[in-house]
């Protein structure tokens, strides 16, 4: 049996590894000639860390995951802690530590684990067709590839998703812009083992430790889509949006490199009622494009891969296996997308009354409520 995997990002490579472990040959195709990850880093929470270990890639997490031991929310003006707490209870309950990791490092290490020579780059899909014998995809260079099944892990702009769904869903603008990048850890910004978030005015500024003595940082600002802003205006834009914010925020704006800082308009897509059509399955962002507000986008793709591998260990009947994959994943990924959307709206001031109430909750937070919510999300994954 042979699978075609479209996409060599986190989801596609996880899927290829999972299928190979289940005894299925995989050919992996990637649209671009060189993968340049969107975003500087990614939060891999314990459900994702467990998936990586299950797939044989646990060493990547241990080596490149940042030392995240505490969380704190800080007042945007004073910079004083609204709440601060240890993540030890989360680690104890979930059985794994969270591992924030540079996207470039994660992508590189996963690609090396699978084998760079085992990915065909510069292969952008145009269409697919299925018949009784299998499924065929065509690429923009005029070539084609055939297999017994097809895993569409080609991202939030998936070219194969309309074929699976029977319609072309529209991406929904979540209402805010995110700037992100990496800076050297500086205790004047935040403790080096803590996820620190400054909140106020429906905006936030976050710092999270990754490997090699660096912070992953991001700024969120509710804004209309399509503003004419770029790297040339980046520092001035952030200085304007965060005028009057605490000294560490000003120091971060001064320290960042505009040329390596990403500006992303955040979108999601309404959850789908299906992930499979015939021999073709959606996986990762192609199947559940989410906002990053609960840090579960990458983890969900890893979960997809683990479930995909498991169903093919149970049966070699493609229809039955993919039907079971869909049954196990549809509700889970819908829940994650909608949880992230709800968190997004509260964080970014869609209704400022609710956002102000959240700020007040943070001032009374011991950590227990936040950790309970995170554990609920994490432990609902396929590996518990």
UniProtKB/Swiss-Prot annotation:
Presence of keyword Amino-acid biosynthesis: no
Q: Name one Pfam family in it.
A: FAD_binding_3
Q: Which Gene Ontology BP annotations are present?
A: purine nucleobase metabolic process; urate catabolic process
> Hey, which pathway is this one from?
Purine metabolism; urate degradation
State the phenotype upon gene disruption. Answer: Mutants show impaired utilization of both hypoxanthine and uric acid as nitrogen sources.
Q: Where is this site: Involved in substrate activation for the transfer of oxygen from the flavin hydroperoxide?
A: 204
Species, as recorded = Klebsiella pneumoniae
User: What name appears for this protein in its UniProt entry?
Assistant: FAD-dependent urate hydroxylase
Show the catalytic activity.
Answer: urate + NADH + O2 + H(+) = 5-hydroxyisourate + NAD(+) + H2O
The answer to whether the entry has keyword NAD is yes
Tell me which family the UniProt entry assigns to this protein.
Belongs to the FAD-dependent urate hydroxylase family.
* NCBIfam families linked to this entry: urate_HpxO (NF033623)
**Top-level taxon:** Bacteria
Question: Which keywords annotate this record?
Answer: FAD, Flavoprotein, Monooxygenase, NAD, Oxidoreductase, Purine metabolism
Q: Which residues bind FAD?
A: 11, 30-31, 43, 125, 285, 295-299
Record lineage: Bacteria, Pseudomonadati, Pseudomonadota, Gammaproteobacteria, Enterobacterales
> Which positions are annotated as binding substrate?
178, 204, 216-218
Q: Which GO terms describe its molecular function?
A: FAD binding; FAD-dependent urate hydroxylase activity; oxidoreductase activity, acting on paired donors, with incorporation or reduction of molecular oxygen, NAD(P)H as one donor, and incorporation of one atom of oxygen; urate oxidase activity
Q: What is its EC number?
A: 1.14.13.113
Function, in words: Catalyzes the hydroxylation of uric acid to 5-hydroxyisourate.
The protein's required cofactor(s) are namely: FAD
């Amino acid at each position: 049996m042979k699978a075609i995997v479209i996409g060599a990002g986190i989801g596609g490579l996880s899927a290829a590894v999972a299928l190979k472990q289940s005894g299925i040959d995989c050919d992996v195709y990637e649209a671009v000639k060189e993968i340049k990850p969107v975003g500087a880093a990614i939060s891999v929470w314990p459900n994702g860390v467990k998936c990586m270990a299950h797939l044989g890639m646990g060493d990547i997490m241990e080596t490149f995951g940042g030392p995240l031991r505490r969380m704190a929310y800080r007042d945007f003006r004073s910079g004083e802690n609204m709440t601060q707490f240890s993540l030890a209870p989360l680690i104890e309950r979930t059985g794994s530590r969270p591992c924030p990791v540079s996207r470039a490092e994660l992508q590189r290490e996963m690609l090396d684990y699978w084998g760079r020579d085992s990915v065909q780059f510069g292969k952008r899909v145009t269409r697919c067709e299925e018949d009784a014998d299998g499924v065929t995809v065509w690429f923009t260079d005029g070539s084609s590839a055939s297999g017994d099944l097809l895993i569409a892990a080609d991202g939030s702009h998936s070219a194969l998703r309309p074929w699976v769904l029977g319609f072309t869903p529209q991406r929904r603008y979540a209402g805010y812009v995110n700037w992100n990048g990496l800076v050297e850890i500086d205790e004047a910004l935040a403790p080096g083992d803590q996820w620190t978030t400054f909140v106020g005015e429906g905006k936030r500024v976050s710092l999270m430790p990754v490997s090699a003595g660096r912070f992953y940082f991001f700024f969120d600002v509710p804004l209309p889509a399509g503003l004419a802003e770029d790297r040339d205006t980046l520092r001035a834009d952030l200085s304007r949006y965060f005028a009057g914010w605490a000294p560490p925020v000003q120091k971060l704006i001064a320290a960042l490199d505009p040329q390596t800082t990403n500006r992303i308009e955040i979108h999601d897509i309404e959850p789908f009622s299906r992930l499979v059509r015939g021999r073709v399955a959606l996986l990762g962002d192609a199947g559940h494009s989410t906002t990053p507000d609960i840090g579960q986008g990458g983890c969900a793709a890893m979960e997809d891969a683990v479930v995909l591998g498991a169903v093919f260990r149970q049966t070699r009947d493609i229809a039955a296996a993919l039907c079971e994959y869909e049954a196990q994943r549809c509700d889970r990924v819908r829940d994650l997308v909608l949880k992230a959307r709800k968190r997004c709206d509260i964080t970014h001031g869609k209704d400022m009354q609710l956002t102000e109430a959240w700020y007040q909750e943070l001032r009374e937070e011991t950590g227990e409520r936040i950790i309970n919510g995170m554990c609920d999300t994490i432990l609902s994954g396929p590996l518990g």
